[in-house]
From Swiss-Prot:
Protein name stated in the entry: Uncharacterized HTH-type transcriptional regulator aq_603
Residue span, HTH merR-type domain: 1-27
A GO BP entry: regulation of DNA-templated transcription
Keyword Transcription: yes
Keywords linked to the UniProt accession: DNA-binding, Transcription, Transcription regulation
Length: 272
C-alpha cells in the first residue's frame, strides 16, 4: 500500500492536502516509512515528526538529517501540547524484547492512536487484539503495556496501526490477558509441529529469509526444524517475532497468525 497516497486521498476528502500537515505522530516504523517521509518532505518542508529515538537514527542513516524530529524519550513527563490546542500523552509501548513503538492519547477527546499492540482484524466481535500475541509474546511486556494503559484512565477509543477502530479499556484488556495466559507454555512437540507447519507452507524465498534469521537457533533438515539449540519456547518467541519480516503477503501473514492462535503462545520471561 502507498501510505502517502492513502493519506493524501483522506486529506483531500476533508478539503486539505499534504501541505497542510503540521505534525506526524509515528506509532510503528516500517521500511516503507522512510520513502513516505522523504516524499512528504518534498512537498512540505515545515512538517514535524514525533517518534521513538531509533526512528530518527534510521532516518539519518538514509540521509534525512535535517528533519524536524522530536524523540519520545526526550519529551518531559511524556506530554506535549499540540500546535493548535489540546494535550497529547505519549505511551512508550514495547513490541517485543527487541522493539519499541508508541501510542498517543488525545486527552480531551479520549482517542488513542496506537501501534500494533492494539491492532484487530476486521469485523469479528471477539477479536480483542490478535496482534498482541505476535508482537507482545512475553508476559512481562504485556504487563508493562497494560500498565501504561491503566495510567491513562478508563474507556478510550483506539485507532490502531492495523485493523478497525474500537472502544477499549485497560480493565477489559487485563481480564482478557489473565484469561488467555493460563496454560501458556507449549510442549516441545507442539512447537515443532506449529513451526514446521508454517515453514512447509511458505515459499522457498520466504522460508530462506526466515531461517536465515533464526536458523542458528535450531537444527534444520530438508526445510524443517528437527531440533532446537535453545529452550523451545524461547525459539518460538524468536520465530513469531521474525514472521512479519519474512512473509511477503499481509493476507498470508493474517492466515498464519489465525492458525497459530489456536494455541496460547505466551512464553516465559527471557533470561536477562
Amino acid at each position: 500500500m502507498d501510505t502517502l497516497a492513502f493519506i493524501n486521498r483522506a486529506l483531500v476528502e476533508e478539503g486539505y492536502s499534504l501541505k497542510d500537515i503540521k505534525l506526524v505522530l509515528i506509532t510503528d516504523f516500517e521500511p516503507s516509512s522512510v520513502e513516505a517521509i522523504r516524499r512528504l518532505l518534498a512537498v512540505n518542508q515545515g512538517v514535524s515528526f514525533i517518534g521513538r529515538k531509533y526512528v530518527k537514527e534510521v532516518l539519518e542513516k538514509f540521509g534525512l538529517r535535517n528533519v524536524r524530529f522530536r524523540a519520545v524519550e526526550e519529551i518531559p513527563s511524556l506530554e506535549f501540547k499540540l500546535p493548535e490546542s489540546g494535550t497529547v500523552k505519549v505511551l512508550p509501548f514495547r513490541n517485543s524484547p527487541q522493539e519499541a513503538s508508541a501510542g498517543y492519547l488525545l486527552e480531551e477527546e479520549r482517542i488513542l492512536f496506537s501501534g500494533k499492540f492494539l491492532g484487530s482484524f476486521g469485523e469479528k466481535g471477539d477479536t480483542i487484539q490478535i496482534f498482541h500475541r505476535v508482537f507482545f509474546p512475553c508476559r512481562n511486556i504485556l504487563d508493562y503495556n497494560v500498565g501504561l494503559l491503566e495510567s491513562i484512565g478508563e474507556e478510550f477509543e483506539v485507532f490502531p496501526f492495523y485493523g478497525e477502530k474500537q472502544k477499549l479499556s485497560a480493565k477489559t484488556l487485563k481480564e482478557y490477558f489473565n484469561y488467555t495466559v493460563k496454560g501458556s507454555v507449549l510442549e516441545r512437540e507442539v512447537i515443532l509441529g506449529l513451526v514446521n507447519g508454517v515453514l512447509l507452507n511458505l515459499s522457498d524465498e520466504e522460508r530462506e529469509n526466515l531461517l536465515s534469521s533464526i536458523g542458528y537457533l535450531a537444527e534444520v533438515d530438508d526445510k524443517v526444524i528437527v531440533d532446537f539449540y535453545t529452550e523451545p519456547n524461547l525459539f518460538y518467541e524468536e520465530f513469531v517475532n521474525t514472521l512479519p519480516d519474512a512473509v511477503k503477503s499481509k493476507e498470508e501473514f493474517y492466515r498464519i497468525v489465525e492458525k497459530l492462535l489456536e494455541h496460547n503462545f505466551y512464553v516465559p520471561l527471557r533470561a536477562v
